[in-house]
Amino acid sequence: VKELETKIGIINPLENGGDCFEPVLRYGLKVCQLVSWDVSQATDVIADTVAAAAAKAGVRIAAFWAGVPGPQVWNFVEGPLTLGIVPEAFRAERVAALKRWADFAARIGTPAIITHCGFIPENMTDPEYAPVVDAIREVAQYCADRGLEFWLETGQETPVVLLRTIERVGTGNIGLNFDPANLIMYGKGNPIDALDTVGDYVRNIHVKDGMYPISGDSLGEEVRPGLGRVKFPELVRKLLDRGFTGDWIIEREIHGEQQEKDIRQTIADLNRWAAAEDSEP
């Protein structure tokens, strides 16, 4: 559990020209995933500021969450047409953006970039499937050439789609940023069972919780970890039993005072859930 304390972090926006680690320290943490959706920030000057500021703050950047240009609609109606590198209309521009973020990530010294690939087709004989695999492979190979991994954030795909896609990409540096809430909120799987299918590829966890969809067009609701359907004590136990040693990045998709309260509560809960794991015979 002492080890877990050094692996709990938050999502931290890339702001202030790269000098942006005060929020991490405010929670008493030493780890974050840095995130930006503005690829114009992917400059050497900002990267060097990030590296210096992180070193000064004593914060480790677990990975860089790489947002991409163009529209993003987080539902089941427009989502397949707008999210990730699945939509052909945005694919080339987004692959290029991910490569720029990979250069940025290599310069700041973080091990991986993360993104949502989108609603990858369930049917592997769909003519749209192979080009998506090729695009993921292009980004993954670019990352590999720079000593980076490419982590796909779970959510818009079933676990078996993720598995077969990783197998087909075949670059050896693909992992998962495992967001258990997204599997539930998108209605794509039970996260605890999903580890049977993709557990070997889990590199980072988003500590997020949510409910299953109750409308055919909209995602389920996101809630504070412990209040949704993830069953965190069981998930933490299964991950640790499988030998997971990565980071636990808390994500609470609200803003203001309640977000801060919820994050502080989740830090305490994570330590408690992990301690319960330690005390078992």
Question: Language-model segments: what does each one mean?
Answer:
Residues V31-C32, F64, V133-R229:
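Acidic/histidine-rich catalytic cores of soluble enzymes
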Residues L14-D38:
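Catalytic domains of carbohydrate-active enzymes, especially glycoside hydrolases
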Residues F21-Y27, D44-W65, R100-G109, Q141-D145, ...:
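Acidic (Asp/Glu)-rich catalytic clusters
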Residues G18-E22, V73-G175, E280:
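Active-site acidic/histidine proton-transfer and metal-coordination neighborhood
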